[in-house]
A protein has these predicted regions:
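PP2C/PPM-type serine/threonine phosphatase catalytic domain
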Residues: 1-182
């Protein structure tokens, strides 16, 4: 039996909470509006609503469906921004999962993360789409330097920013007792 819990808090740093999530059966999603831009809250709400509507209309949900749902939300947001100039620059991250038996399908864009907690170890599944992650991967900065780097909040991919969106996705085998964190 799977138990799902959702919680979103504003925290101590931000003045507004731009996080949104949904849980529907075996499907979960988290979006986080880009706080430095206009419309981050609108983008995250719109994206989570579009993703939910897309996925809950399907009979079964697999890895490609998760990618397609994010791409669908991206197109809807891009189209909305084209009609409402005041929303220019808005965007959001997205991480979406679906559990099918012992398989965890996932898709992500941005820096909202997916983790699997097993046997006392927390393992990050997704890779951030951020400038500091690219610098780390290139060996130009260390993990410690990521935390204070001036570009630590700069995303290299986000939902709703460009017409064409590359979505990362994968499949993880899960075991009884695993905890999935988005």
């Amino acid at each position: 039996m799977n138990n799902f819990v959702g919680l979103s808090k504003i925290g101590l740093v931000r003045q507004r909470n731009e996080d949104r999530f949904f849980i529907d059966g075996h499907i979960c999603a988290v979006t986080d509006g880009m706080g430095g831009y206009s419309g981050g809250e609108i983008a995250s709400t719109y994206a989570v609503d579009e993703i939910k509507e897309y996925l809950t209309s399907l009979e079964t949900v697999g890895q490609q469906d998760l990618c397609d749902a994010i791409i669908h939300a991206n197109q809807r947001i891009v189209n909305r921004v084209a009609c409402e100039e005041r929303l220019a620059g808005m965007g959001t991250t997205a991480v979406v999962t679906a559990i099918n038996g012992d398989q965890l399908y996932w898709a992500s864009v941005g820096d909202s993360r997916l983790y699997v907690y097993r046997d006392g170890l927390l393992r990050q599944i997704t890779t951030d789409h951020s400038m500091v992650q690219e610098l780390l991967t290139a060996g130009e900065i260390t993990k410690d330097e990521m935390l204070s780097h001036p570009q630590r909040n700069l995303l290299t991919r986000a939902v709703g920013v460009d017409q064409i969106l590359e979505v990362d996705s994968g499949v993880e085998s899960i075991l009884p007792g695993d905890r999935i964190l988005l």
